[in-house]
Amino acid sequence: MENKLSFEEAISQLEHLVSKLEQGDVPLEEAISYFKEGMELSKLCDEKLKDVQEQMAVILGEDGELKPFTALGDEA
């Protein structure tokens, strides 16, 4: 799975695969292929969400409050 997909692109592709599978007229081998691709997309989305969650934790700090921005060298 190409990691260059944005979260939105990956979700869109995942929704498309789910829609195809929900129709129920997909041959078994193709359904398995869609399922595998969907699992990869799901994993990619999960990784991207975890990355954002980590970034938000850094921005907000442990107490959930916004930290004041300090530029490099302004810590004096």
From Swiss-Prot:
Primary site of residence: cytoplasm
InterPro entries xref list: Exonuc_VII_S (IPR003761), Exonuc_VII_ssu_sf (IPR037004)
Record field: catalytic activity: Exonucleolytic cleavage in either 5'- to 3'- or 3'- to 5'-direction to yield nucleoside 5'-phosphates
Localization, UniProt: Cytoplasm
Any single Gene Ontology cellular-component annotation: exodeoxyribonuclease VII complex
Keyword terms, alphabetized: Cytoplasm, Exonuclease, Hydrolase, Nuclease
GO biological process, one term: DNA catabolic process
Pfam family membership, one: Exonuc_VII_S
Keyword Nuclease: yes
EC id: 3.1.11.6
GO molecular function list: exodeoxyribonuclease VII activity
Spans traversing the lipid bilayer: none
SUPFAM superfamilies according to UniProt: XseB-like
Source organism, top-level taxon: Bacteria
Family to which the UniProt record says this protein belongs: Belongs to the XseB family.
Physiological role: Bidirectionally degrades single-stranded DNA into large acid-insoluble oligonucleotides, which are then degraded further into small acid-soluble oligonucleotides.
Subunit structure and binding partners: Heterooligomer composed of large and small subunits.
Protein name: Exodeoxyribonuclease 7 small subunit
Source organism (scientific name): Bacillus mycoides (strain KBAB4) (Bacillus weihenstephanensis)
Lineage: Bacteria, Bacillati, Bacillota, Bacilli, Bacillales
